[in-house]
Amino acid sequence: VIGTEWEMPVVLAGMYGLRMSEIIGLRTTNIDLEKMQFGVVEQMPFKVPPGTKTITEMAPTKSNDRILPITEEALPYFLRQFDLIARQKALTEAGGGVYYDNKLFIAKPDGSPQRRDRMSANFGQLIRHLEMPHIRFHDLRHTAATNMHQLTGDFYTVGEILGHTLKGIGISLGISTNLEAVTAQYVDVRLERKQSVLQTYHKALQPKTTVTGKEAGQETSKKAKKKSSEME
């Protein structure tokens, strides 16, 4: 799906474990490329009427709001998505159309909101078209949870990344949810710990295709600063 409209949704679900409603409800104003982090603080309402062009109010997340690091491995995807948004806006306006600037990171080409049910159905069609074994979009979230836990063993931090309660992450991973088993060092999960877990997972996903250092270097830094200033 690299280079298609599905690239970023799959990255957010498969690399970060975001829910579909959180993905299509993520606003560009909650992404800070200069600080290399983004906030999952709202989600798309469950039932968006067909033909909706503007969203004035989002729904709260299912759990506590969370701030997640943008790893070096994930940054190129974020930059490409911002470039895609800019191109779509320019093409829409050049063609005489109206661009609905909802400041959504994942939206239709004219900026209007995606609907959760249509996204799920379209993902199913994509999987069939690619002749891949059947999976639901939500299965990408479970895959992220399982892989992060297997690679790091950090039960509590994985739960914080996913926006799960201890009971929820335990059920998802199929392990004990005895609160007494959670040591005091995990009670306050800081951004640095989330960074460590996510970086371990993301490096394992693409050990030979990481765009860092000399390959991306100063160009990535310049783009990040430029995008950050555009969002302010």
Q: Where are each of the predicted segments found?
A:
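Short, contiguous acidic/charged loop-to-helix segments that flank catalytic cores in large enzymes
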Residues: 1-3, 54-65, 107-115, 131-139, ...
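C-terminal catalytic core of tyrosine-transesterase DNA break-rejoin enzymes
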Residues: 11, 15, 21-22, 118-129, ...
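Residue-level detector of conserved, well-ordered beta-strand and adjacent loop positions
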Residues: 41, 71, 107-109, 184-187
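C-terminal secondary-structure termini that scaffold catalytic or DNA-interacting sites
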Residues: 30, 35, 46-67, 72-74, ...
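Short functional hotspots where side chains directly engage DNA or cofactors
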Residues: 35-40, 136, 147, 159-162, ...
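Active-site/catalytic core of tyrosine-dependent DNA strand-transfer enzymes
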Residues: 46, 69-133, 232
